[in-house]
């Protein structure tokens, strides 16, 4: 029986020498791979009390929406600056070279809501750290953070200490 990691395509030396790029397009192109990915995330949510799923553009949408749907929850998108039509709050975060900004609608999280963040991959943790700040600024409580893939060598989990973080697949390297 295949596991979800069997559907992840590993590309050596991309985008640079010494890096193994973990490509999830092969997971979502396969009905079996996609089902295993969503089922794996849902398995990590068993027993978690939450109200809403939050996911960042764009791959957080791919995994977050079906998880929200399967569990009878709503989904809140986090987008790049300037992509949401109503009043937003924003948070800057660091990239390898420079900064980026993400936004969420100001009315997306109700104070006291219990939130699960779902995304495809954690590397350095910077994007997720910014998402947490947005949620908490609106009065939400992050009760679980789930990734399909964790690149343990990049130590992103350390930025998220104090939160319940899990991953379906863990790779030791970068």
Question: Predicted segment positions?
Answer:
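Active-site-facing substrate-recognition patch
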Residues: 1-52, 100
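Conserved G/P- and acidic residue-centered "switch" motifs that form tight phosphate/ATP-binding loops
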Residues: 120, 125
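Charged, well-structured alpha/beta interaction segments
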Residues: 50-66
């Amino acid at each position: 029986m295949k596991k979800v990691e069997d559907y992840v395509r590993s590309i050596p030396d991309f985008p640079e020498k010494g890096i193994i790029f973990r490509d999830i397009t092969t997971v979502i192109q396969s009905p079996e791979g996609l089902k295993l990915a969503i089922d794996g995330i849902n398995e990590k949510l068993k027993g978690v009390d939450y109200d809403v799923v939050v996911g960042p553009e764009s791959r957080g949408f791919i995994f977050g929406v079906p998880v929200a749907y399967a569990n009878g929850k709503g989904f809140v998108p986090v987008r790049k600056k300037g992509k949401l039509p109503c009043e937003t709050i924003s948070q800057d975060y660091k990239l390898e070279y420079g900064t980026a900004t993400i936004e969420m609608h100001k009315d997306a999280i109700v104070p006291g809501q219990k939130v699960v963040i779902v995304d495809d991959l954690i590397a350095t943790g910077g994007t997720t750290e910014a998402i947490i700040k947005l949620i908490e600024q609106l009065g939400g409580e992050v009760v679980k953070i789930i990734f399909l893939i964790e690149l343990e060598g990049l130590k992103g989990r350390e930025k998220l200490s104090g939160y319940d973080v899990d991953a379906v697949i863990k790779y030791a390297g970068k």
